């Protein structure tokens, strides 16, 4: 594993932040040089909350790249999708700033995990969706799903979108965070999605994130 990977989810509140932090922690334990980035953080004033969570999970302090805002190049105060948060804050989202920050991180670290906002179809600007940006940058995707009701539908829709855009799926992360809602649905969702991943993206990895890993 080397390069820049985009971490997305099938929906909001699916556990992308914890999944990103846990994956970064595992890579650190393997001796890899890894950093996480939250290119657009909404609902914050100064420090990207998701980056703080990543560092806590990774067991490391805020890094020099964090202090230089390379890991959090765009922060908006209103908790909404990036395009709406930018509009309400009265300024445009700077895609060049984000690209430059990611490139600088990639030059310093072996692996960069870029955590997106929401799912693949979340608008970054009025004209650009998150999936458009991923396609432009040719980033492989790490997709986070779970076993809650509706996850199969949302996961398969995400699969279809990735295929339509010609984007490589690196891995599907099954987050057990919602298992307690309905154990039957969670277990069936796991087995079904595991089979579908093998059929639809045969080279992609299957990963699982235990609920006890959450912070």
From Swiss-Prot:
Subcellular location, record wording: Cytoplasm
One GO location term (cellular component): cytosol
Active site: 38
Catalytic reactions of this protein: (7R,8S)-7,8-diammoniononanoate + CO2 + ATP = (4R,5S)-dethiobiotin + ADP + phosphate + 3 H(+)
EC number(s) on file: 6.3.3.3
Residues noted as binding Mg(2+) in the record, renumbered to the chain: 17, 50, 115
UniProt KW keywords: ATP-binding, Biotin biosynthesis, Cytoplasm, Ligase, Magnesium, Metal-binding, Nucleotide-binding
GO molecular function, one term: ATP binding
Binding site for substrate: 42
Residues reported to bind ATP: 13-18, 50, 115-118, 175-176
Cofactors that this protein relies on: Mg(2+)
Pathway membership, UniProt: Cofactor biosynthesis; biotin biosynthesis; biotin from 7,8-diaminononanoate: step 1/2
UniProt record, GO biological process: biotin biosynthetic process
Role, per record: Catalyzes a mechanistically unusual reaction, the ATP-dependent insertion of CO2 between the N7 and N8 nitrogen atoms of 7,8-diaminopelargonic acid (DAPA, also called 7,8-diammoniononanoate) to form a ureido ring.
Description of how the protein assembles with itself and partners: Homodimer.
Protein's name according to its UniProt entry: ATP-dependent dethiobiotin synthetase BioD
Gene: bioD
